[in-house]
């Protein structure tokens, strides 16, 4: 689930959920390995690894200006670590607190695009 449970429940009727399940069962293009590989990629990404596991050393290696965009209700990639690292590198931070969760850019596209454009103009 890429959105919050509240958003999913508000947007998904019982009939829609059953149709989605039926479609997934009959969709030969659906491959559960895709989700497994995405999870493995997220778990393997450790910016501190080249620095002996030190987040402080990793942060000190960042020289660029950084904008971090997080959805506070993201249940797929929790925002805490990105926010902590952002603080360590003095990144600009855009936090959005809505029920779209991991689908933040779908729900708040104009806001995110505007923030990125403004950041790039600096």
Regions found by a protein language model. Give the residues of each.
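Conserved loop-alpha-helix segment in the C-terminal half of the alpha/beta-hydrolase fold
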Residues: 56-68, 72-92
């Amino acid at each position: 689930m890429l959105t919050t449970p509240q958003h999913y429940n508000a947007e998904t009727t019982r009939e829609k959920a059953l149709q989605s399940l039926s479609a997934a069962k009959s969709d030969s293009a659906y491959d559960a390995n895709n989700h497994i590989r995405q999870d493995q990629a997220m778990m393997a990404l450790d910016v501190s690894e080249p620095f002996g596991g030190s987040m402080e050393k990793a942060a000190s290696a960042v020289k660029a200006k950084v904008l971090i965009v997080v959805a506070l209700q993201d249940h797929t990639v929790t925002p805490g670590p990105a926010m902590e690292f952002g603080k360590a590198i003095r990144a600009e931070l855009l936090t959005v607190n809505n029920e779209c969760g991991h689908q933040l850019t779908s729900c708040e596209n104009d806001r995110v695009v505007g923030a990125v454009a403004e950041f790039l103009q600096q």
